[in-house]
């Protein structure tokens, strides 16, 4: 078994077998605390193209202290439907039952996303499998398409979950991030698929995974792949934070005060750039083990006052006052370059409900990079990042890196920087 420690460089878990052959893409990562185990998922493809996806694969990582030993790759053949390709792994751990739910979509044949959108006829199925033993064995597949989407599927040209992890809220609700290409107009009995626009939304369960439902589309902004994190303010009120991919050169952020049923109007974060056409990114929340004294006055006494967040309207803002650190912090991973997918960065936000509070990025990987997924180990001060990377292309491998909260604080060069001040990243 391969071993990774918190002080080591990134370790490849899935490696491209041939430049025009078998490729692994679309990472997803969760940590199962009772088993001290990471579950690292990816798509196995016959080429790097989306339409050449085959099935999902898994590697289990057993953690001892600040090191992880990885078991060999395992193909998840139960996560399949006949005549379909399996895509977009999105796992979530349910803490009461101990179940791991692995959501994904199954898409007919080799039809491309563009073909799905133009036809206006959804060929995707919403499915999951589950495990009671931290990924050793898995249930048979369950198709939730009719249960969750139902007749509304006629307005969805296509949809997908994740990719990346889902979460469980303090209330017990399980959340699976998703997006759908929504067709708003019909002309008599005919769809108008060219009008389809993507919008993020949440799929959720309030009964430990027995039944599932979907929330409202996040509008009006075009948003695609997203992840969410629960933020607890100083007053103890939970807010669900959503970070979504956009084609608008900046990341979209939105907040929900009803556990993800609906979100307020999203806004663009000018501190978090997107490359052309955007890229998936990951976000996790965590409670800091300690707040270093030097981080209390993050920008200095002469710095501009912290702005109230445009995300959350003042009538429902849970924070007692501006400029206070939240009980929850956010960590975010994404390519840092505005022009192309290179230089994977880790950003820290110590006041998620305030504006302009993202740190400069700590560069975890220099060079081509792509999709990523983060996992936070509660009460351990440890984090895992599973990410696409390479020396010439982003699809050469999917690597894993383990790091500590102290490493983050030592690399992000202070925190709440004002807009436009986070242009100089910290290299690893």
UniProtKB/Swiss-Prot annotation:
It catalyses: Hydrolysis of alpha-(2->3)-, alpha-(2->6)-, alpha-(2->8)- glycosidic linkages of terminal sialic acid residues in oligosaccharides, glycoproteins, glycolipids, colominic acid and synthetic substrates; a ganglioside GD1a + H2O = a ganglioside GM1 + N-acetylneuraminate; a ganglioside GD1a (d18:1(4E)) + H2O = a ganglioside GM1 (d18:1(4E)) + N-acetylneuraminate; a ganglioside GD1b + H2O = a ganglioside GM1 + N-acetylneuraminate. GO terms for molecular function: exo-alpha-sialidase activity. The modification Phosphoserine is found at residue 314. The keyword Lipid metabolism applies. A motif (FRIP motif) lies at residues 24-27. Substrate binds at residues 25, 45, 179, 181, 225, 245, 341. It is found in: Cell membrane; Membrane, Caveola; Early endosome membrane; Recycling endosome membrane. One of its GO terms (cellular component) is cytoplasm. The active site is at residues 50, 371, 388. It holds the Pfam family BNR_2. It is a peripheral membrane protein. Its main location: membrane. GO terms for biological process: ganglioside catabolic process; oligosaccharide catabolic process. Expressed in brain. BNR repeats lie at residues 129-140, 203-214, 254-265. The keyword Nuclease does not apply. Palmitoylated; may regulate intracellular trafficking and anchorage to plasma membrane and endomembranes. Its EC number is 3.2.1.18. Keywords: Carbohydrate metabolism, Cell membrane, Endosome, Glycosidase, Hydrolase, Lipid degradation, Lipid metabolism, Lipoprotein, Lysosome, Membrane, Phosphoprotein, Repeat. It comes from the Eukaryota. InterPro entries: Sialidase (IPR011040), Sialidase_fam (IPR026856), Sialidase_sf (IPR036278). Belongs to the glycosyl hydrolase 33 family. Interacts with CAV1; this interaction enhances NEU3 sialidase activity within caveola. Interacts with EGFR; this interaction mediates desialylation of EGFR and enhances downstream signaling. PANTHER family: SIALIDASE, SIALIDASE-3. Exo-alpha-sialidase that catalyzes the hydrolytic cleavage of the terminal sialic acid (N-acetylneuraminic acid, Neu5Ac) of a glycan moiety in the catabolism of glycolipids, glycoproteins and oligosacharides. Displays high catalytic efficiency for gangliosides including alpha-(2->3)-sialylated GD1a and GM3 and alpha-(2->8)-sialylated GD3. Plays a role in the regulation of transmembrane signaling through the modulation of ganglioside content of the lipid bilayer and by direct interaction with signaling receptors, such as EGFR. This is Sialidase-3. It comes from Bos taurus. The lineage of its organism: Eukaryota, Metazoa, Chordata, Craniata, Vertebrata. The gene is NEU3.
């Amino acid at each position: 078994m391969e071993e990774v420690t918190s002080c080591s460089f990134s370790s490849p878990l899935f490696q491209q077998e041939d430049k025009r052959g078998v490729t692994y893409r679309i990472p997803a990562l969760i940590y199962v605390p009772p088993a001290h185990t990471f579950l690292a998922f990816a798509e196995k493809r016959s080429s790097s193209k989306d339409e050449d996806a085959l099935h999902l694969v898994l590697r289990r990582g057993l953690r001892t202290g600040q090191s992880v030993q990885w078991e060999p790759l395992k193909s998840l053949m139960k996560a399949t439907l006949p005549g379909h390709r399996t895509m977009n792994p999105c796992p979530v751990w349910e803490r009461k039952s101990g179940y791991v739910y692995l959501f994904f979509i199954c898409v007919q044949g080799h039809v491309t996303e563009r073909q799905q959108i133009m036809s206006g006829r959804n060929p995707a199925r919403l499915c999951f499998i589950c495990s009671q033993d931290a990924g050793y064995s898995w249930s048979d597949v369950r198709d939730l398409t009719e249960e969750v989407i139902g007749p509304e599927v006629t307005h969805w040209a296509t949809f997908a979950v994740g990719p990346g992890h889902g979460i469980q809220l303090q209330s017990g609700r399980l959340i699976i991030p998703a997006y759908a290409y929504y067709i708003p107009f019909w002309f008599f009995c005919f769809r108008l698929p060219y009008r389809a626009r993507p919008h993020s939304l949440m799929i959720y369960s309030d009964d430990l995974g027995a039944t599932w439902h979907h929330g409202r589309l996040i509008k009006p902004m075009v948003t695609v792949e997203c992840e969410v994190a629960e933020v607890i303010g100083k007053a103890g009120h939970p807010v669900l934070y959503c970070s979504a991919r956009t084609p608008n050169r900046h990341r979209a952020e939105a907040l929900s005060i009803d556990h993800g049923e609906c979100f307020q109007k999203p806004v663009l974060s000018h501190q978090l750039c997107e490359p052309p056409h955007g890229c998936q990114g990951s976000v996790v929340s965590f409670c800091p083990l300690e707040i270093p004294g030097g981080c209390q006055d993050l920008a200095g006494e002469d710095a501009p006052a912290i702005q109230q967040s445009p995300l959350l309207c003042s009538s429902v803002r849970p924070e007692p006052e501006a400029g206070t650190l939240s009980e929850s912090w956010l960590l975010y991973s994404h390519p840092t370059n505005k022009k192309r997918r290179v230089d994977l960065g880790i950003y820290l936000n110590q006041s998620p409900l305030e504006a302009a509070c993202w740190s400069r990025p700590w560069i975890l990987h220099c060079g081509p990079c792509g999709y990523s997924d983060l996992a936070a180990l509660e009460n351990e001060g440890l984090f895992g990042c599973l990410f696409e990377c390479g020396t010439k292309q982003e699809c050469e491998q999917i690597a894993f890196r383990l790091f500590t909260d102290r490493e983050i604080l030592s690399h992000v060069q202070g925190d709440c920087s004002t807009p436009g001040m986070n242009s100089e990243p910290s290299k690893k």
